[in-house]
Amino acid sequence: MVFSTPLLLLYFQTLVLLVYYLVPLRLRNGVLMLASLFFYYWGEQGYTVIMLLSTFIDYTHGLLVRRFKSQGKDRYARLAVASSVFFNLAILFFFKYWDFLARSLRSIGLDWMPVLGISLPIGISFYTFQTMSYTIDVYRGDARAQKSIVNFGAFVTLFPQLIAGPIIKYKALDHQLEGRSHSLDRFASGVSRFVAGLAKKLLIANNLGQLWDACKQLGPGELSVVTAWLGILAFAFQIYFDFSGYSDMAIGLGRMFGFEFMENFNYPYISKSITEFWRRWHISLSTWFREYLYIPLGGNRCSRGRWLFNLLMVWCATGIWHGASWNYLLWGLYFYVLLITEKLLLGRFLERLPGWLRHLYVTVLVLISWAIFALEDFSQMGQYLAAMLGLRGLPLFNSLTGYYLRNYLPILLIAAVASTPVVITHWRKLNCPALKLAVLLLGLLACTAYVVAGTYNPFLYFRF
């Protein structure tokens, strides 16, 4: 059960909000935890046990860390943190990477590991990172050990962001779990953000996904150079509006319950360097890796060789976090090379270029990265990249190019404008509550019609 299915929109969300505001304040975290567990069980059944086990392990390890720290036994506290991290990484490896590694070994003739046919629990990459942050934050003194397993359970299972983020660090919600403010203005803001995210997903991402699906299925003889670029542009907008739409819905729904989650996107497609792009894209993941991997490894306060190694580890981890496939690792390494090239060679040169040219440079490189990301089959990836770069003697245009432009140019232009701050800037300047309400109701009506028509597609990031 996910945010843009009719059942959640019509029943679950309304029911949970109603119960939440009817019960006393002291019971609200319990309501959220039980509702979130039901939400997850509805879609995953048996895998709910894995999440409960992760919750219990990290809850108890947090208490152990606090006890050992208070007794001056720092060595034992570090062991408790290491045990927590090992457990979370172990379950993540088993469910997400075991079969990938087994198949990779078999492809080179090594039958060391059985292929188990394990399905991936939805959201495991998100909630394991959240629970790991808890024990680390407690050890560092950045957060208090949570005495209430209900409060901690609410943090881990919180259904607005359980399945696809943002990845919430425990210290960001520590005090909100025990004392958060509720107001009509905050609730209304949450509703507005939720509807905006829903519209991003259903009205923009899903429609552009149809163009990308059509383009990636074309044979080498059917593609033209422009068609290949149109397809990957559609995917770039699809993944942005799909994932940022989910984040907006999660932030909005969290706000309805009194929580304030971190922003996960900040208009990445307006960036003028690859470094800036990654400050704006999937912010919760990049900040998690910076705080819990890059800095502990030494960050940039070390020799150049060590710094390059630290960055390599971060980008390998970023790549394989997205999926158990070699193309994701290649995607991470691609950005590693781009970033170190910018930092070591291109930084001052880029600063002297006009803004539009820097933006074009980022756009081209990011679109190439999405071809690597989206196509798991290396042969298909190579053919598609060759088509984009005009290396296969393909025509610049063909009849399909005209067909796709006629049918999808309006939604591509809408997506291009909506991926910049233009819309939100004008929305904030609009001083007409009645008009704002009418726009939101119209958007909600359009989304409802889309869902009722049965044209729902799952969020892309659920598979990560």
Regions found by a protein language model. Give the residues of each.
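Membrane-embedded transmembrane alpha-helical bundles that form the catalytic cores
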Residues: 1-463
